[in-house]
Amino acid sequence: MSGTRPAARRTNLTAAQNVVRSVDAEERIAWVSKALCRTTDPDELFVRGAAQRKAAVICRHCPVMQECAADALDNKVEFGVWGGMTERQRRALLKQHPEVVSWSDYLEKRKRRTGTAG
């Protein structure tokens, strides 16, 4: 071994990709600021097992529950309660619907179809 590290991998983002990323970040900041859990101790949301169901109660009346769920599903977040869903519930949805490209779109269509938020 030469003792040298390989060069860091560069990412070639186009201007359009940078704009999309900044728009996504701005949209995320906007909904996160409305989340009911924003002042909650994170330890209450990052629990294991049956305690997750109790933690999900915090989400029930949250105005951005759908955005939160979509963000967690799009980013395949493995831990914690997000958008009123436990880790197990998110894994099940991801497994049942591997074809979904945008969970935001999917959840919005489902909401319109069923007339519910979840």
Swiss-Prot record:
- What are its cofactors? [4Fe-4S] cluster
The residues that the entry says bind [4Fe-4S] cluster are 37, 59, 62, 68
UniProt keyword list: 4Fe-4S, Cytoplasm, Disulfide bond, DNA-binding, Iron, Iron-sulfur, Metal-binding, Transcription, Transcription regulation
| Disulfide bonding pattern of the chain | 37-68, 59-62
Query: Which residues belong to any copy of the 4Fe-4S Wbl-type domain?
Result: 36-92
GO terms in the biological process aspect are: cell redox homeostasis; negative regulation of DNA-templated transcription
From the Swiss-Prot or TrEMBL record, what is one GO molecular function term?
A: protein-disulfide reductase [NAD(P)H] activity
Q: List GO terms (cellular component aspect).
A: cytoplasm; peptidoglycan-based cell wall
Task: Kindly list the places in or outside the cell where this protein is found, as annotated in its UniProt entry.
Answer: Cytoplasm
> How does the record describe the protein's post-translational processing?
The 4Fe-4S cluster is very sensitive to air, degrading from 4Fe-4S via 3Fe-3S to 2Fe-2S then cluster loss. Upon cluster removal intramolecular disulfide bonds are formed.
InterPro entries with a match to the protein in the record: 4FE4S_WBL, Whib
Mutating residue 68 to S leads to what result? Partial loss of the Fe-S center. Complete loss of center and of disulfide reductase
- Role description: Redox-responsive transcriptional regulator that regulates a set of genes involved in protection against environmental stresses encountered during infection. The loss of the O(2) and NO-responsive 4Fe-4S cluster and subsequent redox modifications of Cys residue thiols (possibly by disulfide bond formation) may activate its role in gene regulation. The thiol-oxidized apo-form binds in a sequence non-specific manner to GC-rich DNA, probably in the minor groove. Represses transcription of a number of genes including itself. The reduced apo-form and holo-form do not bind DNA.
- Family membership, please give it: Belongs to the WhiB family.
Assembly and partners? Answer: Homodimer in the presence of reducing agents; the oxidized apo-form makes dimers and trimers while the redeced apo-form does not. Upon over expression in aerobically grown M.smegmatis, apo-WhiB4 forms trimers held together by disulfide bonds.
UniProt protein name: Transcriptional regulator WhiB4
Q: Which organism is it from?
A: Mycobacterium tuberculosis (strain ATCC 25618 / H37Rv)
Provide the gene name from the record: whiB4
